[in-house]
Amino acid sequence: MGLIKKFKDYFLEEDYEEYEEYEEEYEEEEEMRQATKANTKSNVVSLQSVQKSSKVVLIEPRAYAEAQEIADHLKNRRAVVVNLQRIQHEQAKRIVDFLSGTVYAIGGDIQQVGTKIFLCTPDNVDVTGSISIDSDDDTSMKRW
């Protein structure tokens, strides 16, 4: 009888250990599934928070030195309307050149929306449509 008991104990313990290992693996898989579900839920971003943070800044610079302030707004993902009507043409041209480089670097866009008025937008702002500018005014004939 001793030999039969040893066989039973040997085989029953092995089955029991295998069962425990299987049980642990199952629990680990279940925990991984729950962790994956939690990760996918945290990747959701509310569209309302994105829409509320969008801003448009209006700036009428008096000197070329203010171009950096405009570029900072663009870097912070804000659209900027720049009115260059009260600045000398040469300085206005330099500002437009500087802002053109800025919007290129951030993947944005710059558009003329009026005589000496420009709309600079970062990559998170889409502008659709176009505005035709009258070429009757002598100042609009000058090339930027």
UniProtKB/Swiss-Prot annotation:
One Pfam family, short name:
SepF
User: Could you tell me where this protein is found in the cell?
Assistant: Cytoplasm
Query: What biological-process GO terms show up in the record?
Result: division septum assembly; FtsZ-dependent cytokinesis
List the Gene3D superfamilies. SepF-like protein
GO CC terms in record? cytoplasm
The answer on whether this UniProt entry bears the keyword Phosphoprotein reads no
Keywords, A to Z, come to: Cell cycle, Cell division, Cytoplasm, Septation
Q: What is the superkingdom listed in this entry's lineage?
A: Bacteria
InterPro entries in alphabetical order: Cell_div_SepF, Cell_div_SepF/SepF-rel, SepF-like_sf
Q: What biological function has been recorded for the protein in this entry?
A: Cell division protein that is part of the divisome complex and is recruited early to the Z-ring. Probably stimulates Z-ring formation, perhaps through the cross-linking of FtsZ protofilaments. Its function overlaps with FtsA.
Q: Which family does it belong to?
A: Belongs to the SepF family.
Subunit structure, per the record? Homodimer. Interacts with FtsZ.
Q: What is this protein called?
A: Cell division protein SepF
Name of the gene this protein is made from: sepF
